[in-house]
Design a protein with these regions (language model features):
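Hydrophobic cores of alpha-helical transmembrane segments in multi-pass integral membrane proteins
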Residues: 1, 12-33, 45-70, 87-113, ...
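Surface-exposed loop and adjacent secondary-structure segments within mature catalytic domains
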Residues: 6-9, 73-78
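Juxtamembrane membrane-water interface segments that cap and precede transmembrane helices
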Residues: 76-88, 222, 309-310
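Long, amphipathic alpha-helical stalk/connector segments used for oligomerization, subunit docking
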Residues: 185-187, 191
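Flexible, glycine/threonine-enriched loop-and-boundary segments that flank and lead into catalytic domains
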Residues: 217-226
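Surface-exposed, interaction-prone regions used to assemble/regulate multi-protein complexes
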Residues: 259-260
Length: 322
């Protein structure tokens, strides 16, 4: 029993429960903001607010359905319209749940750990407004070479390319905040987590716009390259910045000077970094191999490789993933 929608598979009763939970979350967050004792709202909270509002909008619109039983419903949309709304949701669920929320963490916890303010507050504000203005309209690049109108695909590609600028602006802002603390990379594994997270964020937000270009997408679409791209963001960026932030937060919550063992954090860092790099690299190589084999043709126009041959070629990379 699923809705058949990627990232939104849950049926309508659970969708309603998610809505209730999200409203409660929003009340707690915005209620806390309303009770603040200072007039200024730090930019990290702007990212959290955008994440909460946008996810609510995406969830409600994409989950609109006609129930036919307690465990089954059908989307209110059909055809290419349904596909476009689904990938407007899917793209922005990643963009706001796995990007905006964790940018808020980055803008708070990196300055806390290095003991200095964010490099450029003005740049962080520009980053925020540019990101939320552009990101919403790039979802059509998930549907290149489909029944979606070509102008919609091209417009989504254009917005995707524009996204490179604010994304890298935020990444550079985070890296420059660490400037002057590079000597601590040798002794502070928490800062290492944050540096690696920013590196993956920069890499992923370069790769995303590049893959939205139609000629590149013709090779990458439906392959493991796309999976590798998503995981470079989910494991490399989201995972690393979350771990680093937790290591900053936990001692403060429990009123301790620091974490129990810096050596264990250091071990955690190297295991996580090496594991993520191997995992993602195997997907990239596997995906490019798939794309090249699927596109290869003989002089008479027939396919050079069967689909089964392309699957067999990816076995070594799948073993690396395991």
């Amino acid at each position: 029993y699923t809705s058949t929608k990627e990232y939104a598979e849950l049926e309508w009763p659970i969708d309603l429960l998610i809505t209730v939970v999200w409203v409660a979350y929003a009340v707690v967050f915005f209620g806390t903001i309303a009770k603040r004792t200072t007039s200024h709202i730090y930019v990290a909270n702007w990212f959290f607010a955008a994440f909460i509002i946008t996810i609510a909008l995406l969830h409600i619109i994409n989950s609109m359905a006609v129930p036919v039983s307690l465990f089954k419903s059908y989307s209110m949309y059909s055809g290419a319209t349904d596909a476009m709304i689904q990938w407007w949701y899917g793209h922005n669920a990643v963009g706001f749940f796995l990007t905006a929320a964790f940018l808020g963490m980055m803008y708070y916890f990196i300055p806390v750990q290095v003991g200095r303010p964010v490099y450029s507050y003005r740049l962080s504000v520009v980053h925020f407004w540019a990101l939320i203005s552009v990101y919403m309209w790039a979802g059509g690049h998930h549907l290149h070479y489909t029944a979606l109108p070509d102008w919609t695909q091209s417009l989504a590609m254009a917005f995707s390319l524009v996204l490179f600028a604010p994304s890298w602006g935020g990444m550079i802002n985070g890296v420059m905040t660490l400037s002057g603390s590079w000597d601590r990379l040798r002794t502070d594994p928490i800062i290492r987590f944050m540096v690696v997270a920013l590196s993956f964020y920069g890499m992923s937000t370069f790769e995303g716009p590049m893959m939205s270009i139609k000629t590149v997408n013709a090779l990458s679409h439906y392959t493991d390259w796309t999976v590798g791209h998503v995981h470079s963001g989910a494991l490399g960026w989201v995972g690393m910045i979350t771990i680093g932030s937790m290591y900053v937060l936990i001692p403060r919550v429990f009123e301790r000077e620091r974490m129990y063992s810096i050596s264990l954090i250091n071990l955690h860092f190297w295991l996580a970094t090496i594991g993520v790099v191997i995992y993602i690299a195997s997907l990239w190589i596997s995906g490019i191999t798939q794309g090249l084999m699927w596109r290869a043709v003989n002089v008479d126009g027939t396919l050079t490789y069967t689909f089964v041959e392309s699957v067999k070629a990816t076995y070594p990379f799948y073993m690396i993933r395991v």
